[in-house]
Structures are given as structure tokens and as C-alpha cells.
Amino acid sequence: MSDPVRITNPGAESLGYDSDGHEIMAVDIYVNPPRVDVFHGTPPAWSSFGNKTIWGGNEWVDDSPTRSDIEKRDKEITAYKNTLSAQQKENENKRTEAGKRLSAAIAAREKDENTLKTLRAGNADAADITRQEFRLLQAELREYGFRTEIAGYDALRLHTESRMLFADADSLRISPREARSLIEQAEKRQKDAQNADKKAADMLAEYERRKGILDTRLSELEKNGGAALAVLDAQQARLLGQQTRNDRAISEARNKLSSVTESLNTARNALTRAEQQLTQQKNTPDGKTIVSPEKFPGRSSTNHSIVVSGDPRFAGTIKITTSAVIDNRANLNYLLSHSGLDYKRNILNDRNPVVTEDVEGDKKIYNAEVAEWDKLRQRLLDARNKITSAESAVNSARNNLSARTNEQKHANDALNALLKEKENIRNQLSGINQKIAEEKRKQDELKATKDAINFTTEFLKSVSEKYGAKAEQLAREMAGQAKGKKIRNVEEALKTYEKYRADINKKINAKDRAAIAAALESVKLSDISSNLNRFSRGLGYAGKFTSLADWITEFGKAVRTENWRPLFVKTETIIAGNAATALVALVFSILTGSALGIIGYGLLMAVTGALIDESLVEKANKFWGI
């Protein structure tokens, strides 16, 4: 028959395949690995074809099997094939599950491919593309791993079918010719299985090659440090694979614990029944005597009608009652190990059967008394045997209970170890997830900052287009001087503004003031808020603003009334830390979201300059002279 098919070491993290031994070991591919559980068996010891002596191609010549031989072989083959069938069913169930995982892996791989195409088409960051490329490599390896697993299951199926045919050929009910036909079918199936072995071995070798590429790629990423998320993704995927394996193992361990617990309960019930049976045997009258003859003597008695006919003098019928009593341990032990005759002679010291002239009658009476002791002896022997058998059953049940208790302990320990491993994996995953979240936050921050800087740059270009190159230069200088500074206090700002008030007022009439105020009142706060966040990030301000609408309202009032103090006071209250950069971001946001003309632009820059640096007010004042 064929060599045994076996798949070993299902929890290993390395891959191995021996086409001669048909060994497949599970693989860690940073994801859910191919998993093939132990499947093994050896051809039965009775398997051979030497029991068929061929003559004429299809007849028995000698050593023909007996009916007993045939029935015995039938039972052996049936038991063997039942085992193979159970293994085959389990194998098919696992192949079905692997097929489902393969379908999911294919869908995931296709999704990753589409995501990568989208990133490339959208000119995404190199780090995002690198990360997605690595994800795709993982998805491709996962898919190939499940295809490899299925190939292993297919090889196992063919090997099992071959062995079933070989087993059928071993039947003693079929002719050598029929056996030969089955053997030919089995050998063909075995050849198919060997080809499947070769295919699985080649796939596993290719799997290792691809895994090596993935490992190399990961090492490069770790060494270069340029794709932290890709590395973290790989670590996360590895842990998720371990988590999936652990979850399966926990499920199996729980099933095992449930099974052994059921066996333990069965063992307890069996022990209870055995103990009840023992108690029942000990509580029978003869059982009580076996346990305590002093307390419960064993008794037997029989009425006899003995016919005497040999000697005319004593001819007739003798009516007697024979009795036997055991009331101590020594006598009980002797009777159980000797005959009734021995007991009568040696314990009762009654060796002479003839005590009167009626020889025939005396002998018959003596024999009846011996028979009474034999009768009691047999009853007590039966009782002792039943008690011994019951005690043996109790001991066996206790041993079985002890074994099942140990088995439950081991199953429980195994489950607890897996649960501990689950918690460890969960903690590691939590740490990795936090790192991924932090890395994503950093990348999002970096991306948002880049976008904000670009947004600020585009704004300055728009200032040039709308108000002229000198207006852009003024805005750039204001942004530059504001960095690292705090806004000036109210009195300083008012003093500076008063210095240039007359010049400023020469440039602005009442109509201009009304137009500027109207432009400010028409701005959309939602647009201002959105732009403010981007300008703040672009200019390096990380604080928050409060009462934005109030500030714009105060500015409009100040434009109309020429009373700037309330505005300067409000500015101190809405800007956290009094950062000058924040004020610049606010002003830029208003310029972006309003319809201010060049006069309004100059006034806004002059007022802002008074809160930052006097030189900016001077430059704003000169700006009007353009």
C-alpha cells in the first residue's frame, strides 16, 4: 500500500514540504497563513496481497480463507475505511474553508490593486504609494498561500482515495483478478497523488520565493526608514495573522475542553453506577456474608427424603434437613478455597461418613451434608466474584475518571495559555494600532501643513493679481515680521495708529468707510473659519480663535466711527497667547473671503501693522501713495 500521508506542525511559522513524506507546514505570511492540521495514518498491519495464491488467474489454489478469516478481514477493512472517510470529510471541510478564504483574499487583492492605481493616477505621496505597494505584495502572497493550501488538500484527497482502493483490494471476499483490478486503480490514483504532491511542492517553493521577496522589501523599508506606515502595516498584518490563528486554536481548544468535560461527566456517571453496583452486590445476603461473616453469617439448608433400599432392616425413607453456616472470616476463606468435603472433614472434623449399622443411609446423609456445604460455597463464590467484578469496575471507573480529570486539566491549561496569548497579541496590536494612528496623524499633519503652505503661497499670488506686486510684498513682510512675535498692547497700538491717522484719513472718505464696513459685514464666517485654519497652519500658528464674528463686527464699527480701541481690546481677547502670526492669519482669511478693494486692503494692513510693528504701518501708509 502507499506510504502514509501526513501533514505536521500546523502552528509553525516556517514552510516545509517533503514530497516523499507529503509534509506541509503552516506559514507565517504576515497575514492569515495557510493552515493544514495533522492528517496522518499508516497502512494497517494486516495489509498484504500474499494471502491470494493465483491459479488460472482467478481461482484459489491453497490457503483459502475460512469464514472466520473473511469476517475478521471485513471488520478490519471497514474500520480502516471508516477512519479514512472521517479524515477525508475533515479534509474536504478544511478545503472548503480554505476556498472561502481564497475568495476573500482575491477580493482583497483586487481592491488593493485598484487603490494603488488610484494613488498613482492621483499623484499621491511617494510614502502612500510605497505603503500600498507593500500591501499589494502582502495580498498577493496571501492569495497564493491559500492556493498552495488547497493544492495540499487536493493531494491528501488523492492519497486517501488510493489507500481506500488498496484496502478494498485486501478483501478476502474477492477474487485475485478483482483484487488486481482494484490495485491497478489504486496505483493510478497514487500516481495522480504523487503528481499533486509535485504541484504542491512547486507551489510551496514559489511561495517561499515570494515570501523572501516580501521579507527583503520589508528589510529595505525598515533600513531606509522612509515608509514607516508600510513597516507598521506589515507588523500589524503579522499580528492579525497570529490573532486569526489564535482565534481558531481557541475555538478548537474550547471544543476540546467541552468534549473532555463531557467525557469527564460521563466518567463520573460511570463511577457512580459502578459504585452503586458494588454497593448493591455487597448488600445482597451472600454479599453481606462476604463483607462481614461475623455480622451476617452465611446460611444454607435443604429438606431431604432419602430412600434406603439395600438392607431390608433399614429399608424405607429418611427425612432430614441439612444445614450449613459460615459465621467467621477464617471458615469463610477456607470454604471458598476448598470443597465442601474438605470443609466437613478438616474444619468440622467429620471424617467418618458411617456412624451406624445403616451404612447406606449414613453415607447418603453424609453426602447430603457435603452437598449442602458445596451449595453454600458456590453461592458465596458467586457473590465474591460479583463483588470482585464490581470492585474492578469501580477501580477502572476511578482510573478513567482520573485520566479524564487530567485530560480536562490539560485542555483547560491549553485554553488558558491560548487566552493569555490572545491577550498578549491584543496588547501588541493595540500598541501597533496606536503607532499607526500616530504615524497617520503625523502624515496628515504634514500633508495639511504642506497644503496650507501652498494655500498661503497661492493667496499671496492672488494679492499681487488683485492689488499689485507691492501689496503682495507688504503681505509677505507682515507674515515674516509676525513670526515669533506677540501683538502689541492696546496703548502701544493706539499710539502708533494715531501717529499715522491723519495720513490714513486723507486716503479714505466716508463713502470708502461705508463700503469697507459693508464688505466686512458681508463675509461668510464659514469661509473665514475654513481659511483661517489653513492660514494658521501655513504660517505656523497652532492656537485657537474665539469670538471671530465679534472681531469682524468690531472692525466694521471702528472703520465707521474711527474709534479703534474696542477693536484692539477685542484682538487681545480672541487670540490665544497674543501671537502676532495668528492676527496675520485672521487678516489673510478676511482678505480671501471678502470683497475689499485696494483702499480697504490698505486700511486693514495699516491697522494690523499697528498691532505688530510700526514699520508695517508706515509701509501700509506709503502703499496708498501708489
Curated annotation (Swiss-Prot):
Cellular location(s): Cell membrane
Region entry Disordered, spans: 276-308
Record bears the keyword Protein biosynthesis: no
Polar residues compositional bias, start-end: 276-286
Biological processes annotated in GO: defense response to Gram-negative bacterium; killing of cells of another organism
A molecular function (GO) term: pore-forming activity
InterPro entries given in the database record: Channel_colicin_C, Channel_colicin_C_sf, Channel_colicin_cen, Channel_colicin_N_sf
Keyword Transmembrane applies: yes
Topology within the bilayer: Multi-pass membrane protein
Transmembrane segments: 580-594, 597-612
Stretch list, region Receptor-binding (R): 282-385
Region described as Channel (C): 450-626
Keywords of the record: Antibiotic, Antimicrobial, Bacteriocin, Cell membrane, Membrane, Plasmid, Transmembrane, Transmembrane helix
Cellular-component GO terms for this entry: plasma membrane
Gene3D superfamilies: Colicin (1.10.490.30), Colicin Ia, domain 1 (1.20.250.10)
Organism ancestry: Bacteria, Pseudomonadati, Pseudomonadota, Gammaproteobacteria, Enterobacterales
Family, similarity comment: Belongs to the channel forming colicin family.
Region (Translocation (T)): 23-225
Pfam families to which the protein is assigned, alphabetical: Colicin, Colicin_Ia
Protein name: Colicin-Ia
